[in-house]
Amino acid sequence: MEQLVNELIEANVGRVLVDEPLARYTTMKIGGPADILIVPKHVAGIEKTLQLVKKYKTKWTVIGRGSNLLVSDLGIEGVVIRLGEGLEHLEVEKHRVRVGGGYPLIKLSTLLSRQGLAGLEFASGIPGSVGGAVYMNAGAHKSDISNILSKALILFEDGTIDWLTHGEMEFSYRTSVLQTKRPGIVLEAEFQLQIGERERIVSVMQKNKDYRRETQPWNHPCAGSVFRNPTPYFAGDLIEKAGLRGYQIGGAQISEMHGNFIINTGGASAQDVLSLIALIKQTIKDKFGVAMHTEVEIIGR
């Protein structure tokens, strides 16, 4: 591992941090250390990192801005690549937008709305990066990334880089081909938006933000929606009907504000959250006969 660290530093891939606690990089404020954390400063840095990871036969994981993520208390083995600083380029040409995978999604939706571009209003309250949003087909307010993405530039495990079209991304509810068949890193996304009325777009975005503020507990560390909605039901409704609102294990609590959110009240461990998730699954299965599946990504040792 020491030799790998030395080569990563010599290759100038970006910031190289050893045994770096990941709690500070997740919106849940939970997570043990990464053996090696890389914050690449350019695409070449990511490519070189993957070359060295392959050379040393080391496991690797990619995170964005740490939303929709629960990291194990034991941390993550191998190399963790955090997208951000080196992938925040943006190019807007009429209604076509090309943007780096590390660009903050809320910042992008706000900026484009002010330019009178419609289509990203749903993302006005979704924390995280463009890359993470494309990876999991993030959505809200009856829309999602699949409605606006035309193609995405992906760096695959074998080091090749290629564009995947909308069809090749194989989008479904909170899922893409990158989670199922072709693991890779979203370097860039191209969105097709519509030219609209600026005042109306900004108004819709503000309503979405207000709704989130009034119904979701973003004043506490959390990872967003914990469970996928089991059609035709809503996960939050089932959890609340089961009487679990406010239930707490350790420092993790099912939000009083929204049943599908687990908040860190202070000092929560990943195990606290996992115990709550298991309790919810079993309770909903017993009471309603409905199987619950997590939307939050659980990673680590």
Swiss-Prot record:
InterPro entries: FAD-bd_PCMH, FAD-bd_PCMH-like_sf, FAD-bd_PCMH_sub1, FAD-bd_PCMH_sub2, MurB, MurB_C, MurB_C_sf, Oxid_FAD_bind_N
Active site: 174, 225, 295
Record has DNA-binding as a keyword: no
Record domain FAD-binding PCMH-type: where: 29-196
Keywords (A to Z) from UniProt: Cell cycle, Cell division, Cell shape, Cell wall biogenesis/degradation, Cytoplasm, FAD, Flavoprotein, NADP, Oxidoreductase, Peptidoglycan synthesis
Catalytic activity entry: UDP-N-acetyl-alpha-D-muramate + NADP(+) = UDP-N-acetyl-3-O-(1-carboxyvinyl)-alpha-D-glucosamine + NADPH + H(+)
EC number: 1.3.1.98
HAMAP family reported in the protein's UniProt record: MurB
Role description: Cell wall formation.
Protein name per UniProt: UDP-N-acetylenolpyruvoylglucosamine reductase 1
Organism of origin: Bacillus cereus (strain ZK / E33L)
Gene name linked to the record: murB1
